[in-house]
């Protein structure tokens, strides 16, 4: 707790005082969990009413570049970070609190492809943040110029050519997927900040997005 308090107050000077409580007793956790879920659900519900056309700025995150140097996560009202931990409101708050931090604003620019979700501002940002590895990104397509994946993604969306469809596998699933590969092997080829056609890391909440 003391380490977290030191981290938050040193990284975010706007926080003057903070207290942290860890609950490890099962009875107490069961008691507090419903309220925590209510808070998270209210946050997610608020975001579901917001569309990419309603805002002028997206947000980017490069927290994972330590192990995926060419990865840059683009966060929009209709696309969460791959890890599922950062939505558009979270990105906005983090950027305002620490403008020089790993989460930053991205002017969305011109909408180049409404079906696939290509924006000039996102293209320019990923070209810079990926060290020139790629210069185009489709925010809502798994083909041609798909969004890169780090390694922290909640799940993988993968193409199944035999039925011309997509499957989704959660990172906690330990069995084989319908294509005969477990999550661990699929993650190895999907991660690393590469654009891999037909295989994208994603947040589970993204399934609710109209752009999915």
Placement of each model-derived feature along the sequence:
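Cysteine-centered metal-binding/redox modules
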Residues: 1-212
């Amino acid at each position: 707790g003391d380490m977290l308090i030191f981290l938050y107050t040193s990284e975010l000077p706007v926080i003057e005082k903070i207290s942290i409580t860890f609950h490890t007793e099962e009875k107490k956790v069961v008691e507090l969990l419903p309220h925590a879920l209510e808070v998270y659900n209210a946050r997610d519900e608020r975001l579901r009413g917001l569309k990419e056309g309603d805002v002028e700025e997206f947000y980017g995150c490069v927290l994972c570049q330590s192990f995926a140097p060419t990865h840059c996560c683009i966060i929009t009202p209709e696309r969460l970070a791959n890890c599922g931990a950062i939505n558009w409101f979270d990105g906005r708050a983090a950027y305002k609190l620490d403008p020089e931090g790993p989460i930053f604003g991205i002017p969305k620019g011109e909408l180049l492809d409404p079906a696939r979700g290509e924006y000039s501002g996102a293209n320019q940002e990923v070209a810079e943040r990926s060290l020139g590895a790629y210069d185009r990104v489709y925010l809502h397509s798994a083909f041609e110029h798909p969004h890169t994946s780090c390694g922290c993604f909640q799940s993988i969306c993968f193409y199944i050519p035999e039925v011309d469809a997509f499957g989704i596998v959660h990172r906690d699933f330990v069995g084989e997927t319908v294509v005969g590969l477990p999550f661990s092997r699929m993650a190895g080829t999907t991660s690393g900040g590469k654009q891999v056609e037909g295989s994208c890391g994603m947040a589970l909440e993204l399934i609710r997005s109209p752009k999915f």
